[in-house]
């Protein structure tokens, strides 16, 4: 399978963003014709760092689950549904050959939408322990790439 279009999702922290940018840079070294689109969370650092690295990014209204201020989770289901709907729209418009999730809550809606649309997805886990999003989506991933054995 020839990969020409790749969508990369995730973010929230530099621990997710910089590995995502590194993946895109490494793939471009192999084949400079590959087209990339990043998807992150609105208002988070990826919305600034990814364009500075030379890639296009679209933000989703997704937020993480609050573990200390539980009342802030009241709008989470609505933001998740809107992010899922937008993810389906983004995937249908961009038509990627594969999706790559690098963790963080921003990757959840996009990888779920990719699964729904039959787009193969890969997970990259750079931490010694997988986060909630990567654990939840691991079962249907084509491959999982880890930094630690």
Model segments located where?
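Conserved nucleotide-sugar phosphate-binding/catalytic loop shared by glycosyltransferases and other
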Residues: 3-11, 29-78
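Well-ordered beta-strand positions
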Residues: 56, 98, 142-143
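Alpha-helix C-terminal capping segments
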Residues: 26-28, 93, 109-120, 139-140
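An amphipathic, basic-hydrophobic alpha-helix
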Residues: 66-98, 116
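An aromatic- and histidine-rich active-site surface loop
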Residues: 44-48, 96-117
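Glycine/small-residue-rich loop that forms an oxyanion/phosphate-binding "nest" at active or ligand-binding sites
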Residues: 87, 91, 105, 126
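Short amphipathic alpha-helix
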Residues: 16-27
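Active-site-proximal region of nucleotide-activated glycan assembly enzymes
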Residues: 2-5, 35, 115-149
């Amino acid at each position: 399978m020839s990969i020409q279009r790749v969508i990369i999702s995730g973010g929230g922290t530099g621990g997710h963003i910089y590995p995502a940018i590194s993946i895109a840079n490494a793939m471009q070294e192999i084949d400079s014709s590959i087209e990339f689109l990043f998807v992150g969370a609105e208002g988070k650092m990826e919305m600034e760092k990814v364009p500075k690295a030379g890639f296009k990014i679209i933000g989703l209204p997704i937020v993480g689950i609050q573990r200390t201020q539980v009342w802030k989770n009241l709008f989470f289901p609505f933001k998740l549904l809107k992010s899922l709907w937008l993810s389906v729209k983004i995937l249908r418009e961009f038509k990627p050959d594969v999706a790559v999730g690098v963790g963080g809550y921003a990757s959840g809606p996009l990888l779920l939408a990719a699964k729904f649309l039959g787009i193969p997805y890969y997970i990259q886990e750079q931490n010694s322990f997988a986060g909630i999003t990567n654990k939840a989506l691991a079962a249907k991933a084509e491959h999982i790439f880890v930094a630690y054995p």
